[in-house]
Amino acid sequence: MKITDVIALQLRVKSVENIFDGTQDVLVVVVKTDDGLEGIGEVVSSSYVARAIVEAPRSGGGRHGIAEIVRGLDPLDIDGVWEAMKEGTGWYGRRGVAIHAMAGVDVALWDLKGKALGKPV
């Protein structure tokens, strides 16, 4: 089984009266595999920035988003995927929203692993 894609779905309410309300927006992360399984995670952070970190296309010097970094990897090897994400995000940091985006992928991987093994997570 290999990761074929990572989709970042941004959900945002039309308006929020209290700007400190944590329900304004969220990023849903979907990890897809070549055998049709999908895992779902979420990022409760700056959804616009997290989405860019997930979706950034390949560019010069090996700078690209998480979807490009993990594509082709074994989703059941969660430690291996984490290592790839840590190595591949060096250009834009491994703190703040970047680590939040990686955590969203992590949650999706655990969801996917539970589905693949027929076990609850």
Q: Can you name each region flagged by the protein language model?
A:
Residues 1-40, 44-47:
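Structured beta-strand/loop patches that form or line metal/cofactor-binding pockets in enzymes
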Residues 32-116:
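Metal- or metallocofactor-binding catalytic centers and their adjacent structured scaffolds
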